[in-house]
Amino acid sequence: PNTIVVNIASGLDTRCYRMQEKYVRWYNVDLPETMKIREKFLTENGPVYQIAKSAMDASYTNEMEYGGENVLVIIEGLSMYLSEADVLQMLSIIEKTFQNVTVMIETMSPFVVKHIKEKSIEGSHAKFTWGVKNGKNLQRLVPAFTYKGEVSLVEGMKKMIPIYCGKEGSSEAGRIPYYAGRRPRTKFDFKCVCSTKTKQVELRI
């Protein structure tokens, strides 16, 4: 309960409403044009705040009230559209700002970035640009973080959608290259923690 949540690239995510009373303050961070759309549909008040800035702009942290509380940073659906330099910049800002932070970051494998096209973004100019093989490889890029573990998107699909599971609980989807290469979730342990959608990586400082 005594935790601040920072949801980077929040879009129209509504978890902040479903998890009320389980955090001290919740900050949704996204680009100004995205926040304008969010404001049309979702009114923020109480412990929920909007910050219309890029996660690579360190000044976004100046708009937060922070007094050393535990922090959970959620980064979903973003890293695969950035350059490696941008990803490292984003994580560096988190590391330097918060004392006790857990980061959940969604990542994609380089294979998926190179060979898979996402139908949901075909009409836009967005494209996959960066991926990392696994959480341990990500940890090597951000040595201030300690690797804790990772979870594949397919594992979650097993529980949510029975059709993806075999008779003995094995994932049929995992045998298909497209799904087998989907983003994993990784955990790290150091002052900061980071996690992602496809792969969740947890980093702690």
Feature roles, as predicted:
Residues 52, 202-205:
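Compositionally biased, intrinsically disordered low-complexity segments enriched
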